[in-house]
UniProtKB/Swiss-Prot annotation:
Organism: Halorubrum lacusprofundi (strain ATCC 49239 / DSM 5036 / JCM 8891 / ACAM 34)
Keyword DNA repair: no
InterPro entries: Signal_recog_particle_SRP19, SRP19, SRP19-like_sf, SRP19_arc-type
Family: Belongs to the SRP19 family.
Name assigned to this protein: Signal recognition particle 19 kDa protein
């Protein structure tokens, strides 16, 4: 089973690409949480497990991570873009 780890920094509008943001600014949101990311992952159609003690390598404070399971047929970048699209809908 393939697992991808997704961090809140990937979607954070306050971060630059070099600081870890992986989506364009028009899809990025302010201070995303692992709960919002997990909801978006489920909307995309994958299983999500929240790991709150995880820390992204470019951050000092732990904000958690979401482990996405069952992504054998999807590239990580495509997955991140799909999650970002749903995060915008969740925030509205």
């Amino acid at each position: 089973m393939v697992e991808n780890v997704v961090y809140p920094a990937y979607f954070d509008a306050d971060r630059s690409r070099s600081e870890g943001r992986r989506v364009p600014m028009d899809l990025a949101i302010e201070e995303p949480t692992v709960d919002e990311i997990a909801k978006a992952v489920q909307q995309v159609g994958y299983d999500a497990v929240i790991e709150r003690e995880k820390t992204y390598s470019r951050e000092f404070k732990p904000r958690g991570a979401v482990v996405v399971r069952g992504t054998e047929d999807t590239a990580k970048n495509d997955l991140v873009q799909a999650i970002a699209a749903y995060l915008g809908v969740i925030r509205e």
